[in-house]
Amino acid sequence: MSRKYFGTDGVRGKVGDFPITPDFAMKLGWAAGTVLASTGTKEVLIGKDTRISGYMLESAMEAGFSAAGVNVALIGPMPTPAVAYLASTFRADAGVVISASHNPFYDNGIKFFSNSGTKLNDAQELEIEALLEKALNQNAMQCVASEKLGKVRRIDDAAGRYIEFCKGTFPNHLSLAGLKIVVDSAHGAAYHIAPNVYRELGAEVISINDKPNGVNINDHCGATHLDSLQTAVMVHEADLGIALDGDADRVMFVDHNGHVVDGDEILFILAQAAHSKGEMTGGVVGTLMSNLGLELALKQMDIPFVRAKVGDRYVVEQLKHTGWQLGGEGSGHILSLQHASTGDGIVASLQVLKAVLESQKSLSEIKAGMTKLPQVLINVRLATADADSILATTSVQQAVIKAEEFLGDQGRVLLRKSGTEPLIRVMVESTDNVMTQTQAEYIADAVRAA
């Protein structure tokens, strides 16, 4: 049975449009609270990023949880991985994140973590959706008895707890002293956390895009817009730059030359560092979108590589299935399960900094062992949300077949719908730049015409 509301990363959409409305959020809180209250401590944590709509949705979810008899602990603006960690340490039934990650401010979303710090499984989400449907369509939402209503409290030391957790993943014998780092927090949830983590570990930090006003989150900054970070690294003659997205679950780097180091290259750096010390256990999990250059570079070190479906939840599932610990996406979602239960931009960045220090080389030098193959990704925005019917059209399928025949064994094609936006993503990868671009545009034109 497929999920109706939960996409690859929870519920997400434009604020004010269903389902990102106060009414939906309240009923979702009630449905989730009813399911969670049947087994656990009857307490949830709610964190959010810096979007102005977070206040509205937070209050609505509070009401829903309270109506279900579940207590709520509010931790304010907080990175998504911090909510996953704190839900576990506070022994809550679940953590709730109100965020649309790297999306613009006018979008928002809601996702859940279990008390073990992982995403809810499909079965739990289906159970919540079944109750939610009744609340939305049959007016089935009912309060518990007055004396059993949930209470709400604020936790003031959540940021400090998470900062110490992040620092604890970095070896005690190492220091960032002597490193000049530019940190771009995307005017997002880590604006008051990330710079302090690196400073407290000894780095000289230049912090940019750290003044959220509710509407500037991810606005030409952060992990999806690296221009300002590249400029700042060059202007300040920094050793490197670190960019997080709005909820700090993904990270990208810029080396001292101003060149981008993406998630695929980060995975290579971490695998290479572990391999050089004889500490690489198992292999690496990427996704269908991972650059073929990563797979080839890992193969040179005899490190196994498998591809999961796109979405960090599926990378986690594949890691658990294989028993491996390292995985991620080119977009900067990095999973290092020996350190964190979910993708954590700050924690992943610290592991890269560890690799830089231990190698006694620059970031630019330690990424040089991987050569990225030309990869073109075209996002075709849809007028309607019916991506499945477009993907099923004969003209689109024939375009893919022709492109694959043209590329042969020198490349690959991937066509998929976005789990978070009304987009179809066209990805083509091959050994030749011109061939890659031409075939990607050919397929994208077929999608637009469908």
From Swiss-Prot:
CDD domains: GlmM. Activated by phosphorylation. This is Phosphoglucosamine mutase 2. Its cofactor is Mg(2+). It comes from Shewanella baltica (strain OS195). PANTHER family: PHOSPHOGLUCOMUTASE (ALPHA-D-GLUCOSE-1,6-BISPHOSPHATE-DEPENDENT), PHOSPHOHEXOSE MUTASE. GO terms for biological process: carbohydrate metabolic process; peptidoglycan biosynthetic process; UDP-N-acetylglucosamine biosynthetic process. GO terms for cellular component: cytosol. Belongs to the phosphohexose mutase family. Its EC number is 5.4.2.10.
